[in-house]
Amino acid sequence: MSASLVNRSLKNIRNELEFLKESNVISGDIFELINSKLPEKWDGNQRSPQNADTEEYVEALYDFEAQQDGDLSLKTGDKIQVLEKISPDWYRGKSNNKIGIFPANYVKPAFTRSASPKSAEAASSSTVSRPSVPPPSYEPAASQYPSQQVSAPYAPPAGYMQAPPPQQQQAPLPYPPPFTNYYQQPQQQYAPPSQQAPVEAQPQQSSGASSAFKSFGSKLGNAAIFGAGSAIGSDIVNSIF
């Protein structure tokens, strides 16, 4: 990070502390305590005492190709010494005897160890202002194992006829007892009466018989009329005499 930006932030913090002191938000003792902890001026090449005693290492999770001068290319599994955390998204570190900037979301914390005495490496850092790089998206690797083939059902050879399985004969159900009225009386079927064809009378015989009866009746009628008339007439004659 640029030294000018850090020194500007320190100046802003002191101004804010003075404003809080004048507003009676903090006391003079607190102001002096906080102000004494702040450095007067920050140099970009100096490191904090904690960083001088320990070295922080991170491990690369993804491959990263340098996009411009000053970037540090990474390979998955590389161990990188963190020299400076420029921002939450970008770190400056050393790996494979190279120093550069790499995205913070491409690494994970690995370990820390005590720093060995060695000469300070001069590496000027410029102001970095660029967007964060999202981790690469990997497609799922193809399975190394061959897919299991579904075996086809067994087909008998040609000309071979498999006998059907024997059918199980079901035992007959027991007949219910007679008192349950389960057995119904068979309905009697009546045959319709046969129609007899009417007997046709012989026209000649009937006509002859009817004519005979008519002639016989007319004779009887004439005889009766004649007999009655003669009897009445005799009575009248007798009454006159």
Curated annotation (Swiss-Prot):
Keywords: Acetylation, Cytoplasm, Cytoskeleton, Isopeptide bond, Nucleus, Phosphoprotein, SH3 domain, Ubl conjugation. A motif (PY motif) lies at residues 135-138. One of its GO terms (cellular component) is nucleus. Residues 118-131, 180-213 have a biased composition (Low complexity). SMART domains: SH3. Ubiquitinated by RSP5. Residues 163-179 have a biased composition (Pro residues). Interacts with LAS17, RSP5 and SUP35. Involved in resistance to EDTA. This is LAS seventeen-binding protein 1. It comes from Saccharomyces cerevisiae (strain ATCC 204508 / S288c).
